[in-house]
C-alpha cells in the first residue's frame, strides 16, 4: 500500500469542488494525497486536476498555479483536437479516411508514397504516416547543443518557419516504409493535417476549431495564440531542474502547442466521454492494433483494463506535461496538467490510473497478481495456483495468450519482487513463441535477476541470433561476460 505524507497545508493545496455526493469526499482525498506526493520537492510546480465521475466534474488546483483559469501548454493532446475535426469532416462526407492526402495538397508531391502506397488521411491520425517527427528537423542538434539550451535552439529554428517553408520542405521528405504499418510519433503529421483541413473547409484552422469545438463547448480559454488580455494567465514552464523554458512557437500549434486551462479541458473530456456523438465515437475506434492489448484511434491510445475500455493520451512541451484518461463505459475521466517537463509522463499517468483503480476496485481486487490484465491472464493465474508455478505449460493449455501481455505481466511480477514466478512466465513465453527474440531477451533478464548468469548469457545469445540488431542483448552480454 502506498503511503502519503501529511503535508497538505505546507503545499498551499486548494481544491474547488462541484456539488458533492456521498462518494466524492473519498475521491477528493485521493486526489489531495496524490497531489501532495507529486508536488513535494518542487517549489515551482503547479498542478491542476479534473476528475469526471457520474456526470460531475471535480476540479483541484495545487502548488504555485492555483486557479482553474491558469493556462498550460497541452502538447500532443492538441492533436486530438485536429483529429476530431477530421472525424467531423468524415461525418460531413467532405472526405474519406482512405483518401490520398495529395488530393488536398496544392502542388505535386510524388514523394508522399512508398512503392506506390500513398499516405492516406487515416495515417495522419493513427501515427502511421511515416512522415518525419519534426519539420524543420532539429534532430541534428542532439549531441551538439547543451541540453539546457536545446529548447531555446529549437524555438529559434521554428520562430520564422512559415507555411510556405513547411510545404517546400515537404517536397524533400522520403518515406522509409509503407504508410499504415508502423506507428511513429510525428508532429509533422499533426501540422499537415491542420493545413489539409484548411484546404478542405476553406477556412483558417483557428476558425474551424472555434466553430466545431471550442466555441460549441464554451472553451473561452483555449487558444492557438493567447490573446493579450489572457497572457497574464499563462503559466511559466520549467524543466526538472527548475529552469524556466520557452513556449512552443505557435506555427506548430495544431500539432503540439494549444494552450488551455483545467476548466476548459474538463469540458473537453466530458465531450469526449459522450460517444453518442458520431465524430467522437469515430475517433475512439481502433484503426491500428486492438483495444484488448494496445490500439490506436485518432491520435488516442487505446487499451483495456479489467474489462473496461481505456482511451488516453499525454502531451509534453519544453516546460509542461499533461495527461488525460477516459473510461467511456464508466463515464469516468481524469485530466492532469502541470508546468514541468522531465520524466513527468509516467508520474501523471500513474496518478490518473491510481485514481481510477482506487475509485472502482477494492483493495483485495487490486492486490491480485493479475490485476489490470485480460481475462486470459486471470485464467492462467487460477490454473497456476491450482497446478503450481512449475507447471506453466500445463496451466496455459487451451488459453489464448498474447505474447506482449504475457511479457508485460512477467515484468509486473518482477517489479513486485516475485523473481522466480517472473522467470517461470518468461520461460512460458519463449515456449509459446520460440522465434521471438524479445521473449528470449526477457527470459535472459529473468535468469539474470535470479543470479543465474550462465543461462542469462545463453538466452541473450539466442535473442541475438534471432535479431542481430538487438542492441540490448549486446549491451547485457558485454556486462555479463566481463
For the regions a protein language model found, what residue spans apply to each?
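Active-site-proximal loop and beta-strand segments within enzyme catalytic domains
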Residues: 41-45, 65-185, 203
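Helix-start (N-cap) detector for alpha-helical repeat units in TPR-like alpha-solenoids
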Residues: 80, 403, 437-441, 471-472
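Active-site SXXK
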Residues: 32-35, 49, 55, 73-101, ...
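Canonical positions in the second alpha-helix
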Residues: 429, 462-463
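Catalytic loop of the DD-peptidase/beta-lactamase superfamily, centered on the K-T-G motif
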Residues: 23-61, 103, 136, 144-145, ...
Amino acid at each position: 500500500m502506498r503511503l502519503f505524507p501529511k503535508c497538505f497545508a505546507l503545499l498551499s493545496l486548494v481544491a474547488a469542488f462541484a456539488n458533492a455526493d456521498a462518494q466524492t469526499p473519498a475521491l477528493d482525498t485521493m486526489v489531495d494525497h496524490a497531489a501532495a506526493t507529486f508536488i513535494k520537492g518542487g517549489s515551482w510546480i503547479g498542478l491542476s486536476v479534473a476528475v469526471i465521475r457520474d456526470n460531475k466534474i471535480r476540479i483541484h488546483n495545487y502548488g504555485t498555479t492555483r486557479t482553474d483559469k491558469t493556462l498550460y501548454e497541452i502538447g500532443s493532446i492538441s492533436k486530438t483536437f485536429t483529429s476530431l475535426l477530421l472525424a467531423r469532416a468524415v461525418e460531413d462526407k467532405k472526405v474519406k479516411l482512405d483518401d490520398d492526402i495529395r488530393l488536398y495538397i496544392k502542388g505535386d508531391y510524388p514523394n508522399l508514397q512508398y512503392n506506390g502506397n500513398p499516405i492516406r488521411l487515416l495515417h495522419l491520425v493513427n501515427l502511421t504516416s511515416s512522415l518525419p517527427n519534426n519539420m524543420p528537423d532539429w534532430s541534428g542538434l542532439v549531441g551538439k547543443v547543451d541540453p539546457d539550451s536545446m529548447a531555446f535552439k529549437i524555438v529559434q529554428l521554428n520562430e520564422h518557419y512559415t507555411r510556405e517553408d513547411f510545404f517546400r520542405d515537404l517536397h524533400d521528405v522520403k518515406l522509409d516504409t509503407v504508410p499504415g504499418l508502423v506507428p511513429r510519433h510525428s508532429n509533422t503529421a499533426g501540422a499537415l493535417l491542420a493545413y489539409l483541413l484548411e484546404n478542405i473547409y476553406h477556412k483558417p484552422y483557428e476558425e474551424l476549431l472555434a466553430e466545431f469545438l471550442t466555441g460549441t463547448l464554451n472553451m473561452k480559454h483555449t487558444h492557438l495564440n493567447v490573446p493579450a488580455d489572457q497572457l497574464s494567465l499563462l503559466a511559466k514552464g520549467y524543466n526538472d531542474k527548475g529552469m524556466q523554458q520557452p513556449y512552443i512557437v505557435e506555427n506548430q500549434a495544431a500539432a503540439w502547442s494549444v494552450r488551455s486551462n483545467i476548466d476548459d479541458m474538463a469540458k473537453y473530456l466530458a465531450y469526449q466521454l459522450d460517444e453518442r456523438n458520431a465524430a467522437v465515437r469515430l475517433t475512439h475506434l481502433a484503426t491500428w492494433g486492438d483495444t484488448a492489448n494496445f490500439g490506436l484511434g485518432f491520435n488516442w491510445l487505446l487499451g483495456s483494463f479489467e474489462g473496461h475500455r481505456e482511451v488516453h493520451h499525454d502531451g509534453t512541451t519544453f516546460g509542461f506535461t499533461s495527461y488525460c484518461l477516459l473510461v467511456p463505459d464508466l463515464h469516468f475521466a481524469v485530466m492532469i496538467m502541470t508546468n514541468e517537463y522531465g520524466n513527468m509522463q509516467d508520474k501523471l499517468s500513474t496518478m490518473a490510473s491510481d485514481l481510477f483503480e482506487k475509485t472502482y476496485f477494492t483493495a483485495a481486487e487490486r492486490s491480485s497478481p493479475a490485476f489490470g490484465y485480460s481475462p486470459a491472464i486471470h485464467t492462467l493465474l487460477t490454473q497456476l495456483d491450482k497446478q503450481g508455478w512449475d507447471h506453466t505449460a500445463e496451466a496455459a493449455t487451451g488459453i489464448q495468450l498474447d505474447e506482449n501481455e504475457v511479457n508485460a505481466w512477467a515484468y509486473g511480477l518482477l517489479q513486485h519482487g516475485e523473481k522466480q514466478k517472473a522467470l517461470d512466465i518468461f520461460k512460458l513465453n519463449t515456449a509459446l513463441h520460440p522465434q521471438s527474440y524479445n521473449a528470449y531477451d526477457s527470459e535472459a533478464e529473468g535468469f539474470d535477476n535470479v543470479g543465474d548468469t550462465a543461462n542469462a548469457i545463453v538466452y541473450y545469445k539466442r535473442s541475438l541470433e534471432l535479431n542481430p540488431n538487438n542492441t540490448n542483448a549486446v549491451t547485457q552480454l558485454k556486462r555479463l561476460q566481463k
